[in-house]
Amino acid sequence: MDFFYNILVTGCSSGLGKALFNEVHSHDHLRAFAHYRSMTADPFALYGDVNDSNFPDKLDEFIRTRQIECFINNAGVYEGNVLETNLLSQVKMLQVVYEYFAEQKKGRIININSLAGINPTAGESLYCASKFGLKGFSKSLQLEAIGSGVEITDVYLGGVQTRMTEGRDNYDSLMKADDVARHIIDLVNTKSYYVNEITLRKRNESCAS
């Protein structure tokens, strides 16, 4: 498989998405493209609410025009339209991206998931449902992708210092977004092997975070 060059990261306004975009941008051989919900000063970015009915069409046009070779599926919420944002909209985006990559016979999809997609936790039923759903869809897509040239990696994260976790009592002990971003982009930089899933968490962190 050819080396990836053009990378689109969704949900870049803050937190891990912003850290991922900056990490990609720091590598000379990688070209970073960002997605934001609201307009910014970036003239090369993709804009729009992932829950809008026309967003899949905007995404399709963007990835084809920019010849995106790696899609980092990071956009998500903890409260509000949880199922719509974390699952339904992501399924639609992944269908669009996978179809394009399959046509090109190459491409990498990196789904940013959560330990909540592996182990259920009390008080987070909707969030866990959205993450379990993303896991199921991605695992099925991995099977469909065999022989297509498309590689799909699921990243299950423990607690990360982002806007979503600012109110937690243990915020200071959570993983730093910049550190997590470096590990994830290491996957993009790896040509010699394919990782279909990886879990990142602090050594002393419960698997049910």
List the predicted regions and their residue ranges.
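N-terminal Rossmann NAD(P)H-binding glycine-rich loop of SDR-like oxidoreductase domains
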Residues: 13, 17, 21
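Conserved NAD(P)H cofactor-binding loop of Rossmann-fold oxidoreductase domains
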Residues: 74-79
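Active-site-adjacent segment of SDR/Rossmann-fold oxidoreductases
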Residues: 119, 140-151
